[in-house]
């Protein structure tokens, strides 16, 4: 199941690709209705566990994210972790802009909450 949501001023671009299996979320995230925006993403990620297809690479490059979106990302990571529990390798790359301590701390917080994931927090230019 592939999914592509074009990014806007208020929402990130989301790409879930099946060959190779990857999830990419990048941009700002403060949608008017978090449930409407992230609902299809959460559903698609949860569906991955029903028919595992090998390693999953997750890449996030968030510029800004509000508290409601953080909760939605937590649910996405729950789905990603459930996929890992099916016996598949999962790698997560939380890409942080230089000098963005808030986004770096948020990435580290997610890393701590999901210790079984291969979760890396790093800077990009």
Name each model-derived stretch.
Residues 2-39:
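STAS-typified acidic loop motif
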């Amino acid at each position: 199941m592939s999914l592509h949501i074009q990014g806007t001023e208020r929402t990130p671009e989301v790409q879930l690709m099946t060959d190779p299996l990857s999830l990419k979320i990048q941009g700002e995230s403060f949608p008017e209705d978090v449930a409407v925006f992230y609902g299809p993403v959460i559903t698609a990620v949860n569906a991955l566990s029903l028919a595992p297809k090998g390693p999953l690479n997750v890449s996030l490059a968030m510029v800004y994210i509000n508290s409601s979106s953080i909760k939605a990302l937590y649910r996405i990571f729950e789905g990603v972790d459930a996929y890992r529990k099916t016996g598949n390798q999962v790698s997560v790359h939380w890409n942080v802009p230089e000098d963005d301590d808030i986004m770096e701390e948020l990435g580290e917080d997610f890393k701590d909450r999901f210790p079984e994931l291969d979760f890396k927090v790093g800077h990009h230019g």
